[in-house]
A protein has these predicted regions:
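Beta-strand-turn-beta hairpins that frame and shape the catalytic cleft
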Residues: 1-4, 81-85, 89-94, 107-129, ...
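N-terminal, active-site-proximal structural segment of metallo-dependent hydrolase catalytic domains
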Residues: 1-63, 67-75, 79, 254
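Active-site metal-binding loops of divalent metal-dependent hydrolases
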Residues: 7-8, 40, 132, 164-165, ...
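Surface-exposed cleft-lining segments at the edges of enzyme active sites
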Residues: 10-14, 42-43, 98-104, 130-138, ...
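Active site of divalent-metal-dependent phosphoester/diester hydrolases
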Residues: 16, 46-51, 63-87, 167-241
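Short, Asp-centered acidic motifs that coordinate Mg2+ and/or phosphate
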Residues: 33-34, 125, 158-160, 193, ...
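His/acidic metal-ligating clusters that form di-metal
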Residues: 114-128, 140-170, 184
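Surface polyanion/phosphate-binding segment centered on an Asp-His-Pro turn
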Residues: 162, 242-254
């Protein structure tokens, strides 16, 4: 089972265009079964009316979808709308829940989207998709409390926490970069950084030039034996589609 996390930059590519077919091609080629998306606008308003790029993307990929807004509206060049996180799945999404995260006055709203997926008739898999504050580690730690609270109910069940955590992580086992507090807290709560456990290739996801690690897939210890690999996807199309590169982890599911 392939699980992907991808910040789609409010649907704007580096060429300034909203190209949903381009994103669909990237995800289709990745062979992802489940996708967590950050910086998703849904629905989108333009001077010509309302569109739903998230639903269009899901239709192109023949996937179920869920969306949770972050209580924030973003204005782009030519389009605008509520921003949040989304989940796409080749398997049926049974239900979804949106959790608003703490924020300081005059800062951006953030949220955690929970999607429970029926990967088999009698087995479910839960995805938690989030995007933490971009400015301060202290705010991210505060928001992380709101992330961990619902996760505790799933401690004994298969689940993943993934998304854009906006915290610069170590780049490999021999990295001299200190483990940031957000990652330490998650580790102390029983979560494994998928790239540090099974990473292959260069780990940076943002920005495209000289990238850092800010996008993560966190795996509970009960699921770690199934983790097979984790890598950042690259390619010409990916370099044009967003200001982030997608991160994918592969699990044995039996």
């Amino acid at each position: 089972m392939n699980v992907l996390t991808y910040n789609v930059h409010l649907w704007e590519g580096r060429d300034g265009r909203m190209d949903i077919e381009r994103l669909a091609t990237i995800i289709e080629h990745s062979q992802a079964d489940i996708v967590a998306l950050n910086e998703v606008l849904h629905p989108v308003e333009t001077h010509f009316g309302v569109s739903r790029p998230l639903a269009e993307l899901a239709n192109l990929l023949r996937m179920d979808w869920a969306f949770g807004e972050s209580n924030r509206v973003v204005q782009m060049a030519g389009w605008w709308g509520p921003v949040g996180n989304a989940v796409l799945s080749r398997h049926p999404i049974l239900d979804d829940t949106n959790h608003y995260l703490a924020r300081l006055p005059m800062t951006q709203g953030r949220n955690l989207l929970t999607a429970r997926i029926a990967v088999e008739p009698e087995r479910t898999f839960t995805i938690f998709s989030t995007h933490l504050d971009h400015a301060f580690e202290g705010t991210r730690l505060w928001q992380l409390r709101g992330v961990l609270a619902p996760l505790r109910d799933y401690a004994a069940e298969p689940h993943l926490l993934l998304g854009d955590f906006n915290t610069h992580g170590p780049t490999g086992p021999n990295s001299q970069r200190l483990t940031p507090p957000v990652v330490r807290v998650l580790r102390n709560n029983g979560y494994v950084d998928a790239y540090m456990a099974a990473g292959e290739g260069e780990p940076g996801t943002f920005p495209l030039l000289w990238p850092f690690r800010i996008d993560y897939i966190f795996v509970p210890q009960i699921l770690q034996p199934q983790l097979q690999s984790c890598c950042v996807l690259t390619g010409k199309l990916i370099e044009q589609a967003s200001d982030h590169r997608p991160l994918m982890a592969t699990f044995a599911w039996n």
